[in-house]
Amino acid sequence: MKTAIFTVVLALAVFAVLSFGWEANEKALSEEFTELIHEKEAASETEARECRYFWGECHDHMPCCDWLVCRYKWSITYNICVWNRTFPEK
């Protein structure tokens, strides 16, 4: 009887340790994934500042990308980047 109780307690202890390790690993993966997402967002924001993409608002200080042109649309103060019927060279 004592052996059975000892085995059950030992098994519970092993499961607790494994569970704690799995939870720590899961948190580390979650943090790594979050950092990766933030890095990707920062990279895309840097790209977006270089030029405005299709249907993006444009002004003199916010130029459109090479294959787009800034055109007047719907309002005097609202210009957007539209396609200039060319393709970017790779």
Swiss-Prot record:
Primary location group: secreted
Subcellular location: Secreted
Pfam families: Toxin_12
Positions annotated as propeptide: 20-50
Keyword terms, alphabetized: Disulfide bond, Ion channel impairing toxin, Knottin, Secreted, Signal, Toxin
Domain of life where this protein originates: Eukaryota
Segment forming the signal sequence: 1-19
Protein's job: Ion channel inhibitor.
Domain notes: The presence of a 'disulfide through disulfide knot' structurally defines this protein as a knottin.
Protein known as: U7-theraphotoxin-Hhn1h
